[in-house]
């Protein structure tokens, strides 16, 4: 076991505080509409320019191991806030730095760290309740656009794209952000259910120019196993031919004589047909086939349910207004499923999302939910250079998470004003001793830090501005750092999602309280390199 180095009490906290300051000072310059950029060296490729707090935090590793412990803990604040709310990472870092600084002073003055922590927790709980009570529900597209614009550092185009995407695919819809091949940023919306499987044979193509299959009002056969035997398929094919409608087959695979017969019939014009592989794998495939069945009002044909393919009739097949099959994906538009069945399935998937502990499973369940409930929107971010595209993509990602958070828990005045207004709720809190009261005072001072930092980054005096905001009793009165004017924050579109502000404060307080109550630090000593053996003689005799 490697030897360890240990530091105690004030010495330990001082080292940690230095690490916290180094990381927080690098992150906090990005806060607000006039926040600065941070340039990060990459071991290969061009340097990265970003205004995203968590991206800066993740890159910082300090040489001094004790200082690095402090930096790593604050990095954890930024990462946790990013995971839960997707934005507000810089605010969380600024709050953490302020609480640690004030808390360390109080501990150095001889106060009980555990009572300080209790006081901090009391204050945070009171502020969280206040934010929830004051949050205003997001109702209009304009408000969604404003949240997106603020989170993308004042880029109105990003706000507009996000509002448009959410309007088209709904709040449950999936919105993904990709890098564009061109200099323009564009929005593409896929309505209906799309999955990443294309046609099994190019001979199925009906639109040769676009190389895709387009069917209006087709029947959809949903089968769980491979189809290779033609005899099983014949009854269904004959029934579909008589109906005069096209047929789309979704199965694990279609091969051998079954595929050959379908292709020949398609080429001769006797049958409008196309076959695609079922999406997903294993149990997830079963679930996705069931989703398609519910969306189209059909049945997933499975031998587990005792249904044989030769006994299938037209009433068991799904229907849709339109199906488009390309080389690599299939889109089902306007399925004929019963609304009540689709809603029940959506509720079931939502319950699974709540229960799952795996991030991967949650992501896949959310994709399934979006395909049933709304659709999929893709924002392709363009720019003149690769560096610009990456920087813009960071901002769009932040804005996307912020808009989702706003829809979830509502909005509060931005620019750090919601936290400043929460100072009032700390006045009447009951405490058991003066140390707990000091804990509340620590939070009272710390929640002014984000507003002060936004103003400082804009080149003004934070203390003067915060004083003026607090003099005015109006809840939404604040300071527009972009223009340097005092305005009604909500009316001016300077708003934050309540969830982002809440998460930033809770995460910052949680980790900061742990740092304040730390009494010893243990790190591994670097291994000393063994001395090299002496060089042998040259062997030359004189």
Curated annotation (Swiss-Prot):
Top enzyme category: isomerase
EC number: 5.6.1.7
Broad class of the protein's primary localization: cytoplasm
Keywords: ATP-binding, Chaperone, Cytoplasm, Isomerase, Nucleotide-binding
Binding site for ATP: 30-33, 51, 87-91, 415, 496
Location relative to the cell: Cytoplasm
Pfam families assigned to the protein according to its UniProt record, in alphabetical order: Cpn60_TCP1
Annotated GO CC locations: cytoplasm
Oligomer and partners: Forms a cylinder of 14 subunits composed of two heptameric rings stacked back-to-back. Interacts with the co-chaperonin GroES.
Record-stated family: Belongs to the chaperonin (HSP60) family.
Role according to the record: Together with its co-chaperonin GroES, plays an essential role in assisting protein folding. The GroEL-GroES system forms a nano-cage that allows encapsulation of the non-native substrate proteins and provides a physical environment optimized to promote and accelerate protein folding.
Protein name: Chaperonin GroEL 2
């Amino acid at each position: 076991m490697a030897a360890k180095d240990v530091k105690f009490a004030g010495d330990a906290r001082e080292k940690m505080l230095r690490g916290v300051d180094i990381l927080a000072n690098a992150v906090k310059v990005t806060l607000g509409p006039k926040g600065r950029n941070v340039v990060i060296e990459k071991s290969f490729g061009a340097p990265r320019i970003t205004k995203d707090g968590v991206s800066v935090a993740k890159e910082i590793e300090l040489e001094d191991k004790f200082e690095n412990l402090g930096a790593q803990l604050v990095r954890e604040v930024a990462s946790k806030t990013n995971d839960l709310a997707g934005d507000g990472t810089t605010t969380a870092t600024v709050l953490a730095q302020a609480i640690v600084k004030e808390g360390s002073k109080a501990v150095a003055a001889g106060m009980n760290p555990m009572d300080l922590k209790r006081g901090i927790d009391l204050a945070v709980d009171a502020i969280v309740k206040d934010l929830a009570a004051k949050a205003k529900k997001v109702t209009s597209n304009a408000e969604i656009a404003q949240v997106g614009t603020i989170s993308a550092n004042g880029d109105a185009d990003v706000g507009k794209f996000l509002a448009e995407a959410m309007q088209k695919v709904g709040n449950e819809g999936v919105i993904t952000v990709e890098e564009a091949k061109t200099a323009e940023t564009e929005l593409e919306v896929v309505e209906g259910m799309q999955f990443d499987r294309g046609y099994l044979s190019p001979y199925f193509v009906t639109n040769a120019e676009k190389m895709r299959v387009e069917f209006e009002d087709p029947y959809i056969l949903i089968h769980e196993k491979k189809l290779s035997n033609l005899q099983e398929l014949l009854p269904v094919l004959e029934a579909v031919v008589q109906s005069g409608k096209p047929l789309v087959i979704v199965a694990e695979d279609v091969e051998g004589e079954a595929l050959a017969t379908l292709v020949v019939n398609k080429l001769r014009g006797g049958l409008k047909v196309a076959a695609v592989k079922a999406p997903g794998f294993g149990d997830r495939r079963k679930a996705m086939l069931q989703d398609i069945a519910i969306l189209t009002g059909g049945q997933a044909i499975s031998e587990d349910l005792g249904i044989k393919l030769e006994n299938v009739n037209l009433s068991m097949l799904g229907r849709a207004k339109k199906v488009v099959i390309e080389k690599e994906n299939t889109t089902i538009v306007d399925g004929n499923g019963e609304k009540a069945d689709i809603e029940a399935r959506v509720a079931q998937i939502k319950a699974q999302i709540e229960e799952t502990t795996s991030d991967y499973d949650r992501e896949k369940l959310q994709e399934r939910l979006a395909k049933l409930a709304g659709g999929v929107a893709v924002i392709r971010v363009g720019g003149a250079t690769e560096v610009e595209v990456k920087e813009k993509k960071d901002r769009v990602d932040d804005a996307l998470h912020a808009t989702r958070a706003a829809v979830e828990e509502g909005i509060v005045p931005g620019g750090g004003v919601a936290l400043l207004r929460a100072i009032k709720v700390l006045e009447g809190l009951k405490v058991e001793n003066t140390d707990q009261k000091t804990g509340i005072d620590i939070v009272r001072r710390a929640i002014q830090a984000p507003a002060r930092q936004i103003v400082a980054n804009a080149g003004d005096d934070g203390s003067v501005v915060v004083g003026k905001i607090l003099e005015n009793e109006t809840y939404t009165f604040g300071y527009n750092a972009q223009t340097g004017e005092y305005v009604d924050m909500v009316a001016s579109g300077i708003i934050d999602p309540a969830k982002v502000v809440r998460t930033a404060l809770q995460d910052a307080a949680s980790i900061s309280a742990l740092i304040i109550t730390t009494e010893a630090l243990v790190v591994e000593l670097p291994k000393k390199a063994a001395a090299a053996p002496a060089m042998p003689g040259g062997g030359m005799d004189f």
